[in-house]
UniProtKB/Swiss-Prot annotation:
The keyword Thylakoid does not apply. NCBIfam families: PRK05738.1-1, PRK05738.1-3, PRK05738.2-4. PANTHER family: 60S RIBOSOMAL PROTEIN L23A. Keywords: Ribonucleoprotein, Ribosomal protein, RNA-binding, rRNA-binding. This is Large ribosomal subunit protein uL23. InterPro entries: Nucleotide-bd_a/b_plait_sf (IPR012677), Ribosomal_uL23-like (IPR013025), Ribosomal_uL23/eL15/eS24_sf (IPR012678). One of the early assembly proteins it binds 23S rRNA. One of the proteins that surrounds the polypeptide exit tunnel on the outside of the ribosome. Forms the main docking site for trigger factor binding to the ribosome. The gene is rplW. Gene3D superfamilies: 3.30.70.330. GO terms for molecular function: rRNA binding; structural constituent of ribosome. Belongs to the universal ribosomal protein uL23 family. Part of the 50S ribosomal subunit. Contacts protein L29, and trigger factor when it is bound to the ribosome. SUPFAM superfamilies: Ribosomal proteins S24e, L23 and L15e. GO terms for cellular component: ribonucleoprotein complex; ribosome.
Amino acid sequence: MITEERILTVLRAPHISEKATMAAESANTIVFKVAITATKREIKAAVEKLFEVEVKSVNTLVAKGKTKSQGARQGRRSDWKKAYVILKEGQDIDFAGSAE
């Protein structure tokens, strides 16, 4: 279905913010930075295969890059994609690893 190589390129990093932390605590939702070309189906397959959890749904959005200036020069940061992955009841992703 989805190759090992594509899994590693689809998921970039977990997105940590105040809103993402609140969503994780209340709605069993994990937020990831993903490749701009990634589809919802690819994101779902990558999370299920990599973390061995069941995904209920995936919501995505493209965050527009900010305009930044340094002196007289103006530039723009790249656009990036964010995915809200809602896990099924009883499922959890442990990023820190289980300490024994």
